[in-house]
Swiss-Prot record:
Gene3D superfamilies: Probable inorganic polyphosphate/atp-NAD kinase, domain 1, Probable inorganic polyphosphate/atp-NAD kinase, domain 2. It comes from Rickettsia conorii (strain ATCC VR-613 / Malish 7). NAD(+) binds at D44, G45, H49, N114, E115, D144, A152, S155, A156, Y157, N158, L159, S160, Q216. Involved in the regulation of the intracellular balance of NAD and NADP, and is a key enzyme in the biosynthesis of NADP. Catalyzes specifically the phosphorylation on 2'-hydroxyl of the adenosine moiety of NAD to yield NADP. It comes from the Bacteria. Belongs to the NAD kinase family. This is NAD kinase. It catalyses: NAD(+) + ATP = ADP + NADP(+) + H(+). Coiled coil: none annotated. Its cofactor is a divalent metal cation. One of its GO terms (molecular function) is metal ion binding.
């Protein structure tokens, strides 16, 4: 990959400003709108926020990890930064499109790179009905919540909720309950990426529910529809010896 123009994004309140200043001195950077690659320094959260902010530009993102986990990031190598970008591999992520309706009848849409989640707002468990492609698959799930995860997001919140990890090219989605009470032994479902999943919230007055698309939260919802979209693909760059697919495989063996 031949790259001449790169933009740099970082948190100006970062505790790693000394390292960031070193990177800034080594290379020349351009405006984000003019870039061929956007470098994001920080952790997964910083990267996700900036993907949402700039994904409309259709510019590849290269994350440099100065956070904790950094699953979507690359290890810091200041002097080989440009070389690693030139030699990087591209992973295409298709986000989830979430549409929610709240108790006032307002409808909102949002995109998620990792997952869409719905969860109880009070101490009482949520109750909801699940449809897949217009067919009722569960008349009542009683749980703390549920989530739909992309392959890239399957090793995040989904894994913590005991959902399976999906290979990046699997063309599937995870539907995973969060602390399911009834049916107690239901552990979720694997669905084709073309599926449309709908959650209808039951007893919203007594058991209010919120929904999130990554970090965007919506309150007091009555229904949520989730589907994958190929209209807004996200390009992530990874070092050739540290690809996202390799990381996903490693996670499945406890790595």
């Amino acid at each position: 990959m031949n790259i001449n123009k790169i933009a740099l994004i970082y948190n100006h309140n970062s505790k790693h400003l000394a390292i960031i200043e070193e990177i800034k001195k080594l290379y020349n950077y351009c405006k984000i709108e003019e870039a061929e690659v956007i470098i994001v320094i920080g952790g997964d959260g910083e990267l996700l926020h900036n993907i949402h902010r700039y994904m409309h530009l259709n510019i590849p993102f290269y994350g440099v990890n100065l956070g904790s986990l950094g699953f979507l990031m690359n290890p810091l190598d200041t002097k080989k930064l440009l070389q690693n970008i030139h030699e990087s591999t591209v992973s295409i992520l298709n986000p989830l499109l979430m549409q929610v309706e709240d108790t006032s009848g307002q409808i909102y849409t949002a995109l998620a790179i990792n997952e869409v989640s719905i969860f109880r707002k009070t101490n009482q468990a949520a109750k909801f009905r699940i449809e897949v492609n217009g067919i009722e698959r569960m008349s009542e799930l009683v749980a703390d919540g549920a989530l739909v995860a992309t392959p890239a997001g399957s090793s995040a919140y989904n894994l913590s909720a005991s959902g399976p990890i999906l290979p990046l090219e699997s063309n599937m989605l995870c539907l995973t309950p969060i602390c399911s009470f009834r049916p107690r032994r239901w552990h979720g479902a694997l669905l084709l990426a073309s599926a449309t999943i709908k959650f209808e919230i039951l007893n919203t007055n007594k058991r209010p529910v919120n929904a999130t698309a990554d970090f965007q939260e919506f309150n007091n919802i009555t229904n949520v529809t989730v589907k994958s979209t190929k209209d807004k693909p996200v390009k992530l760059l990874f070092n050739k010896n540290h690809t996202l697919e390799d990381r996903i495989i490693k996670e499945q063996f406890g790595g």
